Amino acid sequence: MSRQNKGCDDLVQGRSHNQKDVILNQTIYGLLALLPIVLCGIFLIGLQWSAKKTMPIILVVTAALAIFIWDMTLNRVSSSIIQGLVITVSVLWIVFGAIFLLNTLKHTGAIAVIRAGFTNVSPDRRVQAIIIAWCFGCFLEGASGFGTAAAIAAPLLVAIGFPALGAVLMGMMIQSTPVSFGAVGTPIVIGVNNGLDKAAISAQLAQEGVQWGEFLQLITSQVAIIHGVIGTFMPLFMVMMLTRFFGKNKSWKEGFAIWPFAIFAGLAFTIPYMITGVFLGPEFPSLVGGLVSIAIVVNAAKRGFLVPKTTWDFAPQKNWPSEWLGKLVVSKEDITLTLSDKKMSTLMAWFPYLLVALLLVFSRVFTGFQSLLNSVAVDLTSILGETDISASFSPLYLPGGLLLISALVAAAFQTRKPVSALNSAFKESTKTVLGAGFVLVFTIPMVRIFINSGVNLSDVASMPVASAELFAGTFDNVFPLISATIGALGAFIAGSNTVSNMMFSQFQYEAAMSLHISPSLIIAAQAVGAAAGNMVAIHNVVAASATVGLLGMEGATLRRTILPTIYYVLFCGIIVMAAIYIFGFQGPLA
């Protein structure tokens, strides 16, 4: 063998070894990045620890990985923690607003009227869950997003007689279909739009005569259609979960018995949702779908359309397990005393919630009003000198501020003793928020360290990207099947569809391009999966639980919400696989 040939062989072998080393390193980093997530699952679901006990440990583990494995500077880790604490204040502000409004309405007597109103629509708890959680919750998600729907719907369900754990489960399950277009389209308009390399992709699209706006609208349409198919069955899934885990007979069948009404309610939302998404864009599908479904489903329920003749209810409250009960209690005695004092119209009782919805829409749609609310803010830019780490707290623009405004209006118009009602509501709400605050103080800083780990001295991919690359490398040609799972993983970590889309949209795009399949469809799967991941996002569960005073039971909620999450990402994966490999969908750049 000549020296030249031997040298070539050595070079090839060297490259081969280098490639193996790179793959090995990527695998190790990917596995280590998953460690905090795996430990969360083991502690919360396997060992049934509370989040109060789990999350401080997970924060320490994540910080240790960031410093010793990812070579993040201590300064960057510290700035991420500060950023997380500011975000925690924002989350707790929303939670406090939701609880404060509910407690105010309890003391004005409005909750008694609302409870009676739902009984008049239908005494069937399955129907009540569909109307409040699905229809009203989807509308709230479209208007506000960021967990507000669950924070408002869960205490409202408790107020009309649902067990706290069941109310949280229903609230978490609506963190799915409407989420991709929540907060007037933020997960798409901000998340996907800013998560992609717009300049580079626009140049590639231009070669095919496609503009950036058209590409983003194509993604929006695909997200709406995928959600529309899967989401149609979510109301049925919700009531089946309700009867299985909270019915006296522990029966799936009792939930399935209402399938005609549940599917009808699903379609009442998803049809206008899909039409709006395809023809009008990402801002209004959840808003329009929610409004239309409220009008149609409430009227149908009043007329008994498709509602089973046999009414389903929970067992008497005295027979409920202690884990079902939260600290938010609306007793029958309170209701009787309140109603004996004065009568209140149904419209007046509901007015504070209608005002919340109106303020949310106005603050997200009208830029002048939006700017006015945002003028009161605390902004931290370049925290500890880290130019890409910042945080802000806008008390009036955040839903918490709008909820507080509605509570003040409610006290002014619904009772002759507004100061007394507000004082009692404040004391009760503060106790609940302080309990949730302890958990979130550890949870959200952990998330920010995880997300900000991409800037490091080792020049390795961030923890989210490393874990996603591990999935992609493992699944190769069946990657479309798990692309939604990656999106869900991002939301599980960050507690946000928007943040998951910002983290993983470019990664999903690159994976699609390398496999020569439709990048728009894979990014759509990312967005759908990220919406589904909100059902198991830890700090969303903690926040929703806090609104009903149910702390320490996060694992019990997660063990249940994992079922609809698996359904969602699996169904999405099957739809995307079928679109690509059976129906041959391509689209731009495929």
Language-model segments: residues:
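Interfacial loop-to-helix junctions that mark the boundaries of transmembrane helices
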Residues: 23-29, 48-52, 78-88, 218-226, ...
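Membrane-interface interhelical connector segments
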Residues: 187-218, 455-476, 503-507, 515
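Membrane-embedded alpha-helical segments and adjacent helix-loop junctions characteristic
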Residues: 78-86, 91-163, 168-169, 416-511
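Transmembrane helical segments that form the transport core of multi-pass membrane transport proteins
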Residues: 289, 319-486
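Alpha-helical transmembrane segments of multi-pass membrane proteins
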Residues: 126-138, 164-177, 190, 204-235, ...
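Hydrophobic mid-bilayer segments of alpha-helices in multi-pass membrane transport proteins
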Residues: 32-42, 49-70, 92-98, 266, ...
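Juxtamembrane and boundary regions of transmembrane helices in multi-pass small-molecule transporters
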Residues: 180-266, 270-319, 528-590
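Extracellular/periplasmic helix-exit of transmembrane alpha-helices
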Residues: 104-107, 185-200, 367-374, 442-463, ...
